[in-house]
């Protein structure tokens, strides 16, 4: 049935075309010129074209009716008995933009050729100019000096190699050739070793200490010999740095000199409080956590003003950090307020065998107002190794004074107490009995002639004088003023387990001391 409908549709179309041809012939005869008639056969007026297209558009298969057969001769029409209706005998029909042959209606896709997919070849021209495509560009950075001097291909490694280290020069280059030429020119002029190229994955930028970051030479890459096992890509970093490493005398002297010579230029993350004998650090926001840790271990910190994320104190002892976090969350309403850590500390004491005494701290936590830094002044540093014990006694006396002043404060909350550290904050309520006992226990354990790890008569007599002023009593057996001064320090070997003796500090005999304290 579908084929019959298609044939009937073709028949209707041909009849319309035939009527159009007849109209053209009549028009040509009326003009009286056969030549003009031939030309007019190839011209179609817009009016006639619109008539044909409108007729085709409104035509539907339901309107098709059978045409009666024509048997009379002489009429200008096709003979239905002749085989002139075959597709090969039909003329092409213009049905749109494409010239369609009637036979195409019987072919697949109505005779419209479908283009085949062409195979890709290397000669295909790109759709756009390749010069407009942006390719990734690698910059090269030359760190001329410092503990991590070299040529880097990553800005993150370069920043880590230069951040926090004063006096380091670096520059960016577009190519490795320019970077190498600049590095060689610098090393030649300075008569130093040739700088190495350090790829991104091979940079070792974590020095052991802040002091070593400024003084130690760059380390060469370690070559590990493995048999049947894969070399680890990097050493697993610990979650946090423990406080186990002991500070050495060289580290302390370096930090002491740094504080005395610091004038505030080039670093706005810290300032110093300068006294006659010692300069203490005051760390502000964005201070180097590694330096804060080492200054804390050296007993050279007066105040810390940390950020809200407490990144400056992340390397301090864990119990101290936890006490600060609990203060922010439990003791103040607005946790976004700035806080401070005010520290009173002793300094370390060394002997020939090593570290004898670690610093002891009393830390006060509170809400900070606007920080007004004092002017840091470059002070003259004349301290010698033999003067360290005298400086330790001076800081020990100040530590005892700060600890005894807690007796005058009636509203104190103890945040944390350990063998060598007491952390407290102000409270709106009176001190509870539990916190008062914790303070008294800490005072009895710490305040003695052995505060610095060895028996020091100067500390004993200072405690006695201070307690007497407050109305208490402090008794020390076998320790009098006559033995508190050493006239010939060179001839005195000092106590067996104490530091090297200095003038007017340590007695000649290591006498055990028993003490008792009563404070009204």
Swiss-Prot record:
One of its GO terms (cellular component) is host cell cytoplasm. Its main location: host cell. Residues 486-520 are annotated as: Disordered. SUPFAM superfamilies: L9 N-domain-like. Pfam families: Cauli_VI (PF01693). It is found in: Host cytoplasm. InterPro entries: Ribosomal_bL9/RNase_H1_N (IPR009027), RNase_H1_N (IPR011320), RNase_H1_N_sf (IPR037056). Disulfide bonds: none annotated. Gene3D superfamilies: Ribonuclease H1, N-terminal domain. GO terms for biological process: regulation of translation. The inclusion bodies are the site of viral DNA synthesis, virion assembly and accumulation in the infected cell. Belongs to the caulimoviridae viroplasmin family. This is Transactivator/viroplasmin protein. It comes from Cauliflower mosaic virus (strain BBC). The lineage of its organism: Viruses, Riboviria, Pararnavirae, Artverviricota, Revtraviricetes.
